[in-house]
Each structure stands twice: as structure tokens, then as C-alpha cells.
From Swiss-Prot:
NCBIfam families tied to this protein: alt_F1F0_F1_al, atpA, PRK13343.1
Phylogenetic placement of the source organism: Bacteria, Pseudomonadati, Thermodesulfobacteriota, Syntrophia, Syntrophales
Keyword Cell inner membrane tagged: yes
SUPFAM superfamilies: C-terminal domain of alpha and beta subunits of F1 ATP synthase, N-terminal domain of alpha and beta subunits of F1 ATP synthase, P-loop containing nucleoside triphosphate hydrolases
Full protein name: ATP synthase subunit alpha 2
Length: 519
């Protein structure tokens, strides 16, 4: 027998020691088996993917492709699922793996987003690094219950005379802006955002399907007016996948809801929902959903209604915050009776219609007062507006009809001519340059002057200069009254007389100044 061979006792001791060491090592490991459900891509199209092998996947669940590319489950059939991609699909092909995540899509929210330009997933587009958001909220959330809502009671001042006086918007309201291309829809939005600089309103601008150059111009304007500190800009460009365009307005709404739940006032602008509807139509047709009117799927009304219903004013017990929604719609050939415009008109609390006819005449902003309405905001107007412009909407509409009638060459009596001249001056006063939102006192002074006849003796081409002189005089001479108007105090009879006296003095002083200059 070989003496070098270990004895049975030694071998047993060695094995016991080895297994003991192995047990000690294994006991220190917390290895857990992780179940991953992985399927296979069967088809890749323009912004959509079909896959199989995911029997337990849920609708609207987030899935991951190779390279951490993301998708959202849209269709769930017996043998395959339809996925909308949130990234470009160049790196996805038939046979690629697709993995479940077990969670729904969410977006970053919080103060860290202010001043940033992001895509709908919360990824930065401004080259300023990742967003350090402390929380994330789901893309889709239930709208507040009826008993959680409070009446809309506080005005949202746009700084635009014709809107604040005739088509007022309240905080928590949904007001649609619609009109043809190049009629000034985005210009109204920019002025509204600029006017919130001292109003404690957080503004979220959501660009959907717009050209990158157009969005860059919007960002540049907001930067130049130093509005970005209270703004969030969410961008899904026209060259982005349609899936990213589809989720963009929902992402912007979730970002706004975070602040609303904390008692803050939020303004969310969707620019525009026409492109959003087209992106949804494209995805639905590619995924073979049954088309309806104008090839839109049957739930096109629902996808906008469920989003805009999240805009509201909460009860004080829930913080008293508000989310005001201003969707934009692009019409074709001034047709506001098309499918998507009529859907949005029926969902929202009013609409502001921009007329290409007025735009071509140089009447800016080109708001058609007769076709515009605010079903909620009128109750929120500051008392001073109701005092000076209570019947202005009716009288202005009558003036427009009278002006149309007078073009037929009918002989007019003195009273009719006087109404026409007054109406033309009202129209001149309601004109306003872009990027020049006015404070409440400036608007009240101008409106009171024109409705009381203080500008009847001024030629139309000099109305703008006279308005500026009146506003300067009111700020210099009546600063206390301006502060009271801003606070929402009503105008007394004495206040009206004081304002009118200052306006008439400012108007009368101009010819004297010219005479002094000429001499």
C-alpha cells in the first residue's frame, strides 16, 4: 500500500472542512432568481413594433428593447402585442428581444424641472445635464373627483386687452385657441407667459410635432424676457417618433399636477393638439385599429377629454391649487366645424378664434370676438373690467354688423355714423403689439377712455399715441388707484371720474405740446 495515500479518516476530515468552507461562502450570498419575461420582435414599422412571447404583458406597460430603447404597449391581442416606440427604431429589427418592465410610464416632476427644456420622458434637451428630480409621477392619472373641485374664481391675466376684457380666462379653466396657420396663436401664448412674471403662475409649454427651429425661437423669446425660471418646456419635435408626440401632452399635464397638488397655480399650453391627433391617428392605423371619421380612431375624443379633465381648481382643503389648460388647434381654410376642432370646442370651457381675414387687415391680435367665448372666465373678471367693459362685447358685435351693412352705400343718420366712429376707435384700442402685455390699470384706463368718448376727437392713426399718453398720465398721477385696481377693488363713481379727467387732460395736452414745439 502506498504510504502517501491519505487514510480514510484524513480524507473524511478534509471533505468535511471543504464542505464547511463552501457552506460558509454560500451562506454569505443572497443570490435570488429573477424572473424576466422576454419576447421576440416580429415586425418593425414607422414608430411601431409587433412582438410575441409576452403572454402576461399589460396594456400601457413599459417595455425595453436592446440598447435600453423604450416602448409602450398599445395593443394586446391573443397571439401578439402592438408597441409604440418612444425612441427611433433603427437599432430594432425582426428577431430582437423585447423585455417587460412590469411598470407603467412615468415622468420626473418637481422644482428641478423649472427653467429646463425636456423631452416627454424627462430627458434634457438643453445641454445642462440630467434632471435631478426627487419624484416621478405616472403619465396617466385620474382626473380630480367632482367633490374635490372648487368653482373657478380667480382670473388668469393674459395682458392682452381684448382677451382680459371680452373673453376672460380663469385659473383652472380650459380655453381653446384655434385658427389657421400663421394667424398669431403662439404669439398670444408667448404674451400670456410673459405676463405671468409677477403672478406666481408656473407655465408649462408643450410643443407637439412642431419644427425644431420654431420651438427654438419660442425658447429664445422666453429666455430674452427672463421667463424661464417659472417655465418648463416639453418638446416632442416633428422629427421625433409619433409615440413620443402622443405622450407629450400627458407628460406636461403630470408635471403640472405635481405643482397643483401643492397649492400652486399652473398654466399648461398644448401647442398643438392637431398634430397630436394626427400622431395618434398614424399610430392607430399602423396598429390596424378600426378607422372612423376622417380616418381617426373611435376614441380620439376620449384621449383629449381624459387629459383636459385633469385641469381644474382644487378645494382649499386640498391646497387650493389650479391647473389651467390652453390647447391650441390649427384649422384649415377657417373651418371650425371640422372633426377635431368641434371635439375640442365641446370639451373645453370656451374658445378664442383667430381670423385670417382680420390678420390680413392688420388687426392684431386677430381675435374674432363674435366667434370667441369664455363660458367660465367672465365670472372671475376683476370688478373694474365689468365696470368699464360690461356691455362692450355686445356693442362691439353690433358695430361690426353695422359696419358690414354700411358698405352697401346706404345713407346713414347721425347716430349711426357716431356709433361707427366710436366702434372704429374701440377696434384701434383693442389692437396690441406683440411682446407688450399690459397691466390691469393700463387696460382699464384705455378701455374707459374709449367707451366714454374721450377719444372721439382723435384720428384713428393717432389712437395708439393717445393711449400711451393716457397710460403714462395714469401711472404718474394715480398710482394709488392703479394699486387698488390691481388688487381687484371695484371702481367707484369717483374713481371713474378721476380716471376720465386724467385721460382727457393727457389727450388735450398733446396738441398744445405740438404747438409749443412748432413755435
Amino acid at each position: 500500500m502506498n504510504r502517501d495515500m491519505p487514510s480514510g479518516r484524513e480524507l473524511k476530515s478534509f471533505l468535511e472542512q471543504t464542505f464547511s468552507t463552501l457552506d460558509a461562502v454560500l451562506s454569505g450570498q443572497n443570490a435570488r432568481l429573477q424572473e424576466k419575461e422576454v419576447g421576440t420582435v416580429s415586425f418593425v414599422g414607422q414608430g411601431i413594433v409587433r412582438a410575441s412571447g409576452l403572454p402576461h404583458v399589460r396594456s400601457e406597460e413599459l417595455v425595453v428593447f436592446p440598447g435600453n430603447l423604450l416602448g409602450l404597449v398599445f395593443n394586446v391581442d391573443l397571439d401578439e402585442i402592438g408597441i409604440i416606440t418612444l425612441d427611433h427604431t433603427e437599432d430594432i429589427s425582426a428577431g430582437s428581444a423585447v423585455r417587460r418592465t412590469g411598470r407603467v410610464l412615468d415622468v420626473p416632476v418637481g422644482e428641478a424641472l423649472l427653467g429646463r427644456v425636456l423631452d416627454p420622458m424627462g430627458r434634457p434637451l438643453d445641454n445642462r445635464g440630467e434632471v435631478a428630480a426627487a419624484r416621478r409621477l405616472p403619465l396617466e392619472r385620474e382626473a380630480p373627483a367632482v367633490m374635490d373641485r372648487a368653482p373657478v374664481s380667480v382670473p388668469l391675466q393674459t395682458g392682452i386687452k381684448v382677451i382680459d376684457s371680452l373673453i376672460a380666462i380663469g385659473r383652472g379653466q380650459r380655453e381653446l385657441i384655434l385658427g389657421d396657420r400663421q394667424t398669431g396663436k403662439t404669439a398670444i401664448i408667448l404674451d400670456t407667459i410673459i405676463n405671468q412674471h409677477d403672478k406666481n403662475v408656473i407655465c408649462i409649454y408643450c410643443a407637439i410635432g412642431k419644427q425644431s427651429a420654431d420651438t427654438a425661437r419660442v425658447v429664445s423669446v422666453l429666455e430674452s424676457f427672463r421667463t424661464l425660471p417659472y417655465c418648463i418646456i416639453v418638446v416632442a419635435a416633428g422629427e421625433d417618433p409619433p409615440g413620443l408626440q402622443y405622450i407629450a401632452p400627458y407628460a406636461a399635464t403630470s408635471m403640472g399636477e405635481y405643482f397643483m397638488k401643492r397649492g400652486k397655480d399652473v398654466l399648461v399650453i398644448y401647442d398643438d393638439l392637431t398634430r397630436h391627433a394626427r400622431a395618434y391617428r398614424e399610430l392607430s392605423l399602423l396598429l390596424r385599429r378600426p378607422p372612423g371619421r376622417e380616418a381617426y380612431p373611435g376614441d380620439i375624443f376620449y384621449i383629449h377629454a381624459r387629459m383636459l379633465e385633469r385641469a381644474t381648481h382644487l378645494r382649499e382643503e386640498l391646497g387650493g391649487g389650479s391647473l389651467t389648460a390652453i390647447p391650441i388647434i390649427e384649422t384649415e381654410a377657417q373651418d371650425i366645424s371640422a372633426y377635431i376642432p368641434t371635439n375640442l370646442i365641446s370639451i373645453t370651457d370656451g374658445q378664442i378664434y383667430l381670423s385670417s381675414r382680420l390678420f390680413q387687415k392688420g388687426i392684431l391680435p386677430a381675435i374674432d370676438v363674435g366667434k370667441s367665448v369664455s363660458r367660465v372666465g367672465g365670472k372671475t373678471q376683476l370688478p373694474a373690467y365689468r365696470t368699464v367693459a360690461g356691455d362692450l362685447r355686445l356693442s362691439y358685435s353690433q358695430f361690426e354688423e353695422l359696419e358690414t351693412f354700411s358698405r352697401f352705400g346706404t345713407r346713414l343718420d347721425e347716430e349711426t355714423r357716431r356709433k361707427l366712429e366710436r366702434g372704429r376707435r374701440v377696434r384701434e384700442i383693442l389692437k396690441q403689439k406683440q411682446y407688450n402685455p399690459l397691466c390691469v390699470a393700463d387696460q382699464i384706463a384705455a378701455l374707459l377712455s374709449v367707451t366714454s368718448g374721450a377719444l372721439d376727437g382723435i384720428s384713428l392713426e393717432n389712437i395708439g399715441a393717445a393711449e400711451k399718453r393716457i397710460q403714462e398720465a395714469v401711472h404718474v398721477q394715480l398710482s394709488d388707484l392703479c394699486d387698488r385696481i390691481k388688487k381687484g377693488e371695484p371702481l367707484t363713481v369717483h374713481d371713474r371720474k378721476t380716471l376720465l379727467d386724467a385721460a382727457r387732460s393727457a389727450v388735450a395736452a398733446e396738441p398744445e405740446r405740438h404747438r409749443n414745439a412748432d413755435s
